[in-house]
């Protein structure tokens, strides 16, 4: 585990974004942990989050020309990542996002910011079913651009209805890498090393055994 990954997990726990207990997911599964990126909801938290995303961008080695934040949750994530890449990694890159509803007046269209062109790195919080990413892939295709990859905060490493996870299905269907700041593997490693949180390790390990990929 990289230092920034350990720091991110601690940051997510401190902000109440990553919690342990018993949670019912949309899928109906009862999960021993829950991740809610919407709680990175202050200026300082968003700035710090952008730095973690930027570190993961650099670590991934994915070559790209523009950052894309899918509406709505991806918008602040892409902007914070762009700021952090410029300020901390000397990489001043264009970024853009889409509107849910296209505008007929003003600048018009459904895209805001930089032109969506070349190789595109998609920034989002999580991939649950993969539906949103499939919509984004169509937006990129419509602009004659190319998806270079997807970066998310947490990979739950959890299969869907079939044998693959939603992330694996996206990688298979579109031939692009999906990378994350952390995955469940690193969360398990963090729990094992933390005396206060170690009590949650058996439940998370059991969940991984049942639903993991």
UniProtKB/Swiss-Prot annotation:
Bilayer-crossing regions: none
One GO CC term on file: cytoplasm
Enzyme Commission no: 2.4.2.10
Annotated coiled-coil segments of the chain: none
Catalysed reaction equations from the record: orotidine 5'-phosphate + diphosphate = orotate + 5-phospho-alpha-D-ribose 1-diphosphate
One of the Pfam families matching this protein, by short name: Pribosyltran
Keywords linked to the UniProt accession: Glycosyltransferase, Magnesium, Pyrimidine biosynthesis, Transferase
GO molecular function: magnesium ion binding; orotate phosphoribosyltransferase activity
Annotated positions binding orotate: 34-35, 128, 156
Job of this protein: Catalyzes the transfer of a ribosyl phosphate group from 5-phosphoribose 1-diphosphate to orotate, leading to the formation of orotidine monophosphate (OMP).
Complex formation: Homodimer.
Protein family (similarity comment): Belongs to the purine/pyrimidine phosphoribosyltransferase family. PyrE subfamily.
Name by which UniProt lists this protein: Orotate phosphoribosyltransferase
High-level lineage: Bacteria, Pseudomonadati, Pseudomonadota, Gammaproteobacteria, Pseudomonadales
Gene that produces this protein: pyrE
